Regions:
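Catalytic active-site module of serine/aspartate enzymes centered on a nucleophile-bearing elbow/loop
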Residues: 258-283
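Active-site loop/oxyanion-hole signature of alpha/beta-hydrolase fold enzymes
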Residues: 57, 91-131
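Short beta-strand/loop motif that positions the catalytic acidic residue
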Residues: 222, 228-230
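Conserved HGGG/HGGXW glycine-rich cap/lid loop of the alpha/beta-hydrolase fold
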Residues: 50-99
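Flexible "cap/lid" loop of the alpha/beta hydrolase fold
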Residues: 138-146, 152-185
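Acidic catalytic loop of the alpha/beta-hydrolase fold
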Residues: 233-237
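Active-site nucleophile elbow and catalytic-triad environment of alpha/beta-hydrolase enzymes
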Residues: 202-218
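Alpha/beta-hydrolase fold catalytic core
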Residues: 2-6, 11-14, 21-61, 86, ...
C-alpha cells in the first residue's frame, strides 16, 4: 500500500488540521468505535519476543477477530457485543499496534500470522473461525494458505493478495485520511512507546511496498471455507481485485456490503455482524 505513502502523508497533513466534514452518505463517514464490553479474560501473551495484548469474551465455538493496519482491537467492539452472545470471541492488538509491544524484526504477513497462531496456542485454542479486516484479512489468508488445520472458516474483508490490488485513489480520500489521523492519536494514547509512531508507520509501510504477493495458483490451494467481503464503496481495494480473489479461491463466497466502505465494521456494525455470523455459522 505504501508505494503511495509519501503522497498520502502529504495529503493527511493538509486535511488533519481541518474538521472532518459531515458526509452525505454512510460510506463516507468514520464513526467512533462503540465501547468495548467487559472481557472475561484479558492480558498480555508472551509471543515471538513481544507482549501481545488480547481479550476474550463469551463462550462457545471460538472466533478470532483481527484488525487492520495501524489500528487496534477496539474497532471490533460492536462485533464483540453481538458475536460473544453465541461464541467465544478473541481479539488482540497485532505486534506494534495498540497496546502490544514490538521487536525490531521486519514486519511481514507470515510473521504476523505466526504471532496469532502463537496466541491461539497460548489460549489453548486448536481451531477457530477468523474474521479479518484489511491487514487482518490478509493475515487470515496467510493462515489459510500455510496452516489450514487451525481454521474452520475465514471471513476476509477489505483484503488484498497483491500490492496492485490497492486503489491509487486512496491517497486523496478524506475518509482514509481521517483514519490515519485517528490511528496516530490512538497510538499515542495506547502504545507503550507513544513517541515512536513515525518509526512504527515506516516499518509497516516497508511491508506494504512488497506484500502480499500471492499467485492465483497459491490461492487455488486454499481449502478453508472462505468469504471474500467488501463494502460497495471501498476506498482502498479495487472492486475487480476483490472479485478476482473470490474467483481464485475455490468455493469462496463473495459478499458485498451495501452503503459501506473499507470501514464497514464501524459504518454498518449490525449488518457486518450478521453477515459474519451467517457465514461462520453456516453448515
Amino acid at each position: 500500500m505504501t508505494r503511495f505513502w509519501k503522497a498520502f502523508a502529504i495529503f493527511v497533513l493538509f486535511t488533519a488540521s481541518t474538521a472532518f466534514a459531515v458526509a452525505e452518505e454512510r460510506w463516507q463517514t468514520l464513526p467512533e468505535p462503540a465501547a468495548m464490553p467487559k472481557a472475561d479474560q484479558s492480558g498480555y501473551a508472551p509471543v515471538n519476543g513481544f507482549q501481545m495484548y488480547y481479550a476474550v469474551f463469551g463462550a462457545g465455538d471460538p472466533v478470532l477477530l483481527i484488525h487492520g493496519g495501524l489500528g487496534h482491537a477496539d474497532v471490533w467492539a460492536s462485533q464483540v457485543a453481538t458475536l460473544s452472545k453465541t461464541h467465544k470471541v478473541i481479539v488482540a492488538d497485532s505486534r506494534g499496534h495498540g497496546r502490544s509491544t514490538r521487536t525490531e524484526q521486519p514486519y511481514g504477513y507470515d510473521l504476523m500470522a505466526s504471532d496469532y497462531l502463537a496466541l491461539l496456542d497460548y489460549l489453548k485454542v486448536d481451531k477457530t473461525a477468523l474474521i479479518g479486516w484489511s491487514d487482518g484479512g490478509i493475515i487470515g489468508i496467510d493462515i489459510a494458505l500455510h496452516h489450514p488445520e487451525r481454521l474452520t472458516r475465514l471471513f476476509a474483508q477489505a483484503a488484498n493478495v497483491t500490492t496492485d490490488g490497492v486503489d491509487p485513489g486512496v491517497i486523496t480520500n478524506k475518509t482514509f485520511a481521517a483514519y490515519i489521523d485517528r490511528s496516530g492519536r490512538d497510538y499515542k494514547k495506547m502504545s507503550k512507546t507513544p513517541d515512536q509512531y513515525d518509526a512504527f508507520v515506516a516499518q509497516i509501510s516497508h511491508m506494504w511496498e512488497t506484500e502480499p504477493a500471492w499467485t492465483k495458483e497459491q490461492l487455488g490451494k486454499i481449502t478453508t471455507p472462505t468469504a471474500i467481503v467488501a463494502g460497495d464503496h471501498d476506498e482502498a481495494i479495487k472492486r475487480e481485485h476483490t472479485e478476482y480473489m473470490a474467483s481464485a479461491i475455490p468455493g469462496a463466497k463473495l459478499i458485498i456490503l451495501p452503503n459501506a466502505s473499507h470501514f464497514a465494521m464501524l459504518q454498518a456494525p449490525d449488518e457486518y455482524s450478521q453477515a459474519a455470523l451467517g457465514f461462520i455459522d453456516a453448515k
